[in-house]
Amino acid sequence: MNTVLSTVLFAIGAYLIGSISFAVVVSKCFRLADPRSYGSKNPGATNVLRSGNKKAAILTLLGDGAKGFVAVWLVKHFGPDYGVQESGVALVAIAVFLGHLWPIFFRFVGGKGVATALGILLALNGWLGLATLITWLVIAYAFRYSSFAALIAAIFAPFYYALMFGPDAILLAVVAMSVLLIYRHGKNIGNLLAGKESRIGSKKK
């Protein structure tokens, strides 16, 4: 199979995997309100937690993280057999992330990408993902703001990658994901500056 075609097919598959919104699916399974209708209106684990159902929030978190991990893991392990190179892995990472942000199955209304980005980073390199996760945990524990922790982790992730592996195509993908994640947190940034951002564990209003 042609290398370019293989790369494109892996990327399309990754986008479709990313388009599965676990926040919406899990909420329906638990007969909860659509997460796009309350709280931050973001279909993500933090907003599902505002429903008061911790199990649903955990499943959402795991699902969103798993889809990022699986998409990148598949191309890393099977892509080389079809000629997919490092740039192809970078493209797949971006594709699954874009699927989460703008899912074709849910009218292109998706989440902010925190859990999916973490899954992607873990698949790219375990130490990279772990360093980014620890950054999030430390900031979240200290300040109790999930969004603020995500922003700080997003800023540090490219630096972690650059320190570990230097400049390459995957670094560009990590930078792109960080920029998109920060962009998707625009409203949260405004709320943080205004002192109106919801803290971790707060219930929906």
UniProtKB/Swiss-Prot annotation:
The chain crosses the membrane at residues 6-26, 55-75, 89-109, 120-140, 162-182. GO terms for biological process: phospholipid biosynthetic process. Pathway: Lipid metabolism; phospholipid metabolism. Pfam families: G3P_acyltransf. InterPro entries: G3P_acylTferase_PlsY. It is an enzyme of class 2 (transferase). Keywords: Cell inner membrane, Cell membrane, Lipid biosynthesis, Lipid metabolism, Membrane, Phospholipid biosynthesis, Phospholipid metabolism, Transferase, Transmembrane, Transmembrane helix. SMART domains: G3P_acyltransf. HAMAP family: PlsY. Belongs to the PlsY family. This is Glycerol-3-phosphate acyltransferase. It comes from Herminiimonas arsenicoxydans. The lineage of its organism: Bacteria, Pseudomonadati, Pseudomonadota, Betaproteobacteria, Burkholderiales.
